[in-house]
Amino acid sequence: YTKRKRGHPKDSIFWGEAGPLRNGKGSPYEAGYRLPCIVRWPGKVPAGRVNNAIFATIDFMPTFANLCGFETPEDRRIDGMDQTELLLGKRETGRDYFYFNNAGVRKGKWKYLKANAHFHGYAVEDGRKKVDELYDLESDLGETTNLAAKHPAIVSELRQLTEDISKWK
Protein backbone atom coordinates (compact mmCIF):
# COMPACT_ATOMS: atom_id res chain seq x y z
CA TYR A 1 0.00 0.00 0.00
CA THR A 2 2.69 2.50 1.02
CA LYS A 3 4.73 1.79 -2.08
CA ARG A 4 1.72 2.37 -4.35
CA LYS A 5 0.72 5.60 -2.62
CA ARG A 6 4.04 7.29 -1.88
CA GLY A 7 6.82 4.94 -2.89
CA HIS A 8 9.75 3.86 -0.78
CA PRO A 9 13.06 5.66 -0.43
CA LYS A 10 15.79 4.36 -2.72
CA ASP A 11 17.63 1.35 -1.24
CA SER A 12 14.96 0.74 1.42
CA ILE A 13 15.56 -2.41 3.41
CA PHE A 14 12.54 -4.39 4.49
CA TRP A 15 12.24 -6.97 7.23
CA GLY A 16 13.44 -10.21 5.72
CA GLU A 17 15.52 -8.45 3.09
CA ALA A 18 18.03 -10.87 1.59
CA GLY A 19 20.29 -8.28 -0.01
CA PRO A 20 22.11 -9.77 -3.01
CA LEU A 21 20.80 -13.28 -2.33
CA ARG A 22 18.11 -14.77 -4.53
CA ASN A 23 14.62 -15.57 -3.30
CA GLY A 24 13.75 -16.13 0.36
CA LYS A 25 12.29 -18.43 2.98
CA GLY A 26 10.94 -21.67 1.59
CA SER A 27 13.23 -21.79 -1.42
CA PRO A 28 16.44 -23.76 -1.96
CA TYR A 29 18.23 -20.59 -3.12
CA GLU A 30 20.75 -18.97 -0.79
CA ALA A 31 18.31 -16.46 0.72
CA GLY A 32 16.27 -19.42 1.93
CA TYR A 33 19.18 -21.15 3.67
CA ARG A 34 22.19 -18.93 4.19
CA LEU A 35 22.34 -17.39 7.65
CA PRO A 36 25.14 -15.92 9.72
CA CYS A 37 26.15 -17.78 12.84
CA ILE A 38 27.96 -15.73 15.46
CA VAL A 39 29.71 -17.68 18.19
CA ARG A 40 31.47 -16.26 21.22
CA TRP A 41 33.30 -18.48 23.67
CA PRO A 42 36.43 -16.71 24.98
CA GLY A 43 39.43 -18.98 25.21
CA LYS A 44 37.76 -21.67 23.08
CA VAL A 45 36.45 -20.17 19.84
CA PRO A 46 39.01 -17.98 18.03
CA ALA A 47 37.93 -14.32 18.09
CA GLY A 48 37.44 -12.45 14.83
CA ARG A 49 37.41 -15.59 12.72
CA VAL A 50 35.22 -15.68 9.60
CA ASN A 51 34.47 -19.01 7.95
CA ASN A 52 32.14 -19.92 5.09
CA ALA A 53 32.12 -23.67 5.73
CA ILE A 54 28.84 -25.54 5.43
CA PHE A 55 27.35 -25.79 8.93
CA ALA A 56 23.66 -26.66 9.17
CA THR A 57 21.29 -26.15 12.09
CA ILE A 58 21.00 -29.95 12.31
CA ASP A 59 24.68 -29.96 13.31
CA PHE A 60 24.11 -28.04 16.55
CA MET A 61 22.75 -30.99 18.54
CA PRO A 62 25.65 -33.42 17.91
CA THR A 63 28.18 -30.58 18.24
CA PHE A 64 26.82 -29.32 21.56
CA ALA A 65 26.35 -32.88 22.82
CA ASN A 66 30.05 -33.51 22.22
CA LEU A 67 31.07 -30.21 23.82
CA CYS A 68 29.01 -31.11 26.90
CA GLY A 69 30.43 -34.63 27.09
CA PHE A 70 27.27 -36.44 26.00
CA GLU A 71 26.88 -39.21 23.45
CA THR A 72 24.39 -38.71 20.63
CA PRO A 73 21.49 -41.18 20.73
CA GLU A 74 22.10 -44.43 18.89
CA ASP A 75 18.48 -45.58 18.86
CA ARG A 76 17.61 -43.17 16.02
CA ARG A 77 19.25 -41.59 13.01
CA ILE A 78 20.82 -38.20 13.68
CA ASP A 79 21.13 -36.20 10.46
CA GLY A 80 23.51 -33.65 11.93
CA MET A 81 27.24 -34.13 12.32
CA ASP A 82 29.62 -33.12 15.08
CA GLN A 83 31.29 -29.88 13.99
CA THR A 84 33.28 -29.29 17.19
CA GLU A 85 36.65 -29.03 15.41
CA LEU A 86 35.25 -26.47 12.96
CA LEU A 87 33.70 -24.44 15.78
CA LEU A 88 36.93 -24.44 17.83
CA GLY A 89 39.06 -23.40 14.83
CA LYS A 90 40.89 -26.72 14.56
CA ARG A 91 39.50 -27.35 11.07
CA GLU A 92 38.52 -24.95 8.27
CA THR A 93 36.01 -27.15 6.44
CA GLY A 94 32.54 -28.24 7.48
CA ARG A 95 30.29 -30.83 5.94
CA ASP A 96 31.15 -32.14 2.48
CA TYR A 97 27.69 -31.41 1.15
CA PHE A 98 24.27 -30.13 2.14
CA TYR A 99 21.06 -31.65 0.80
CA PHE A 100 18.11 -29.39 0.00
CA ASN A 101 15.05 -31.53 0.63
CA ASN A 102 13.54 -32.63 -2.67
CA ALA A 103 15.45 -29.91 -4.53
CA GLY A 104 19.19 -30.49 -4.90
CA VAL A 105 22.53 -30.37 -3.16
CA ARG A 106 25.44 -28.06 -2.39
CA LYS A 107 28.94 -29.51 -2.49
CA GLY A 108 31.88 -27.18 -1.97
CA LYS A 109 31.38 -24.09 -4.10
CA TRP A 110 28.77 -25.74 -6.32
CA LYS A 111 25.01 -25.76 -5.84
CA TYR A 112 22.83 -27.99 -8.00
CA LEU A 113 19.04 -27.71 -8.18
CA LYS A 114 17.14 -30.33 -10.12
CA ALA A 115 14.69 -29.29 -12.81
CA ASN A 116 11.65 -30.23 -10.74
CA ALA A 117 13.02 -28.85 -7.47
CA HIS A 118 10.36 -28.47 -4.80
CA PHE A 119 9.69 -25.03 -3.36
CA HIS A 120 7.61 -24.77 -0.21
CA GLY A 121 4.28 -23.00 -0.62
CA TYR A 122 5.52 -19.77 0.94
CA ALA A 123 8.55 -19.38 -1.32
CA VAL A 124 8.92 -15.93 -2.81
CA GLU A 125 9.50 -17.15 -6.36
CA ASP A 126 8.60 -20.36 -8.10
CA GLY A 127 8.20 -19.06 -11.63
CA ARG A 128 11.62 -20.47 -12.47
CA LYS A 129 12.25 -22.43 -15.63
CA LYS A 130 12.06 -26.16 -14.95
CA VAL A 131 15.68 -26.90 -15.92
CA ASP A 132 18.68 -28.20 -14.01
CA GLU A 133 20.51 -25.34 -12.34
CA LEU A 134 24.17 -25.13 -11.32
CA TYR A 135 25.73 -22.17 -9.54
CA ASP A 136 29.28 -21.36 -8.47
CA LEU A 137 28.63 -19.81 -5.06
CA GLU A 138 32.18 -18.46 -4.78
CA SER A 139 31.77 -16.20 -7.81
CA ASP A 140 27.97 -15.88 -7.97
CA LEU A 141 26.46 -15.86 -4.49
CA GLY A 142 23.29 -14.27 -5.88
CA GLU A 143 22.73 -17.32 -8.13
CA THR A 144 22.20 -15.21 -11.23
CA THR A 145 24.10 -17.29 -13.81
CA ASN A 146 23.07 -20.90 -14.42
CA LEU A 147 26.25 -22.81 -15.36
CA ALA A 148 24.60 -26.21 -15.93
CA ALA A 149 25.22 -26.21 -19.69
CA LYS A 150 28.91 -25.32 -19.21
CA HIS A 151 29.62 -28.03 -16.61
CA PRO A 152 27.64 -31.18 -17.51
CA ALA A 153 30.01 -33.47 -15.57
CA ILE A 154 29.45 -31.53 -12.34
CA VAL A 155 25.69 -31.53 -12.95
CA SER A 156 25.78 -35.29 -13.48
CA GLU A 157 27.81 -35.87 -10.30
CA LEU A 158 25.57 -33.66 -8.15
CA ARG A 159 22.36 -35.03 -9.69
CA GLN A 160 23.53 -38.53 -8.75
CA LEU A 161 24.42 -37.40 -5.22
CA THR A 162 20.95 -35.82 -4.89
CA GLU A 163 19.30 -39.07 -6.04
CA ASP A 164 21.44 -41.18 -3.70
CA ILE A 165 20.57 -39.02 -0.69
CA SER A 166 16.87 -39.01 -1.64
CA LYS A 167 16.87 -42.82 -1.63
CA TRP A 168 18.71 -42.96 1.71
CA LYS A 169 16.25 -40.86 3.64
Predicted regions and their residues:
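C-terminal cap/loop subdomain of S1 sulfatases and analogous C-terminal strand-loop tails that border
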Residues: T2-E30, K44-R49, A53-E133, L137, ...
